Each structure stands twice: as C-alpha cells, then as structure tokens.
Amino acid sequence: WDVAKRLLQHERNMIAGMGLGGGGSAKKKKDQVITSGMATMAKTYAGERNGKLADPALRQKIASFDINSHAFSLTMKRASEESKSSNSGPSPASSMFKYYGSESNKLRYELMLEAMGTKALGWEGEGFGPAELAITREWLRTKANSIEGGTSEVQLNIIAKRVLDLPQ
C-alpha cells in the first residue's frame, strides 16, 4: 500500500505540471517569467486595440491566469527543492498540486475557448483550422485531469486530512 501511495504522489505531481501548460517543460532563462501565450492567441480572435487585447475582461482573466500560473510554478519549484533537501520524496502536498494543476489546466483551455468565440465550437469540417480543432479536443480532455491520479474530491479529502489536519 505504501508503494501504491508513493506512485500516486508521483503521478499527481506530474499531472499538477499540466496546469502550467505542457508539464512545465518550457525553456526559460533564469528569473524570466513565461506567460501562457494566451494573450497573443486571443488577439488573433478577439482583436487588439493599441497593442492590447481588445476585450478588457478577457485581458484581465488572462493576466490573472498568468500571474497565478507563475506563482504556482514557483511554489512547485520550492516544494521540489525542499523535498530534495530532506530526501523525503513527494509529500501529501502533491494532492494540493494535483488539484490546483488540474483545475488550472481546465481554466487555461476554457479561456482559450472564450477567446476563440464561435471558432471553438468545431469538432471537424470546413471553417475550423487544425489548431482550433485541437484546442477544442484538448479542452474536452482536460475534464479527465480531475479524475486521473485520484479525483478532485479525493484530493480535497486528502488535503483536509493530511495537510490541514482537519477532523473527519
């Protein structure tokens, strides 16, 4: 059982990275903030005004997402370094990372769909480009993130019991 729990912790850490956009695999220079790139993509669909995304509400949502993603990335990095220095392996905090990562990944694709407008409605056929179809399908795929590695509800229970030490 201990081995199975440890494997799930590693799986949750991997899934958590998806909320960063591609498992956190983007290359960056030291101290460089990587944004989601959604603002650039949104300008293509929603237009731009004075070099900014024309829709101020969508612009605010994307900026908020990028800020939260950067904070999450730094938190995961800090937890990873703490884990390495103590040689303790993944902690119950992996449930927090998995939960937040899967929710963040869903939000990322929902924002892309919002930016794409009616171009996000396609499944196949003319009128939709390959990238648009891929984003729509990936959005549907994000729903599985809240199931794999333990459902979001299970993660919240683990967080309540093992991280926050709340009574049952």
Segments (PLM) and residue ranges:
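Secondary-structure capping and boundary motifs in well-ordered enzyme cores
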Residues: 54, 64-68, 89, 93, ...
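Glycine-rich beta->alpha junctions and the first turn(s) of the following alpha-helix
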Residues: 1-73, 145, 161
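Short alpha-helical basic/polar micro-motif
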Residues: 60, 99, 158
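Short, well-ordered loop/turn and helix-capping segments at boundaries between secondary-structure elements
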Residues: 6-13, 44, 68, 77, ...
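Short coil/loop linkers at secondary-structure junctions
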Residues: 48, 52, 89, 119, ...
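C-terminal helix-coil-helix/basic helical segment that borders enzyme active sites and/or dimer interfaces
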Residues: 56, 70-127
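Glycine-rich phosphate/cofactor-binding loops in nucleotide/flavin-utilizing enzymes
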Residues: 1-21, 119-168
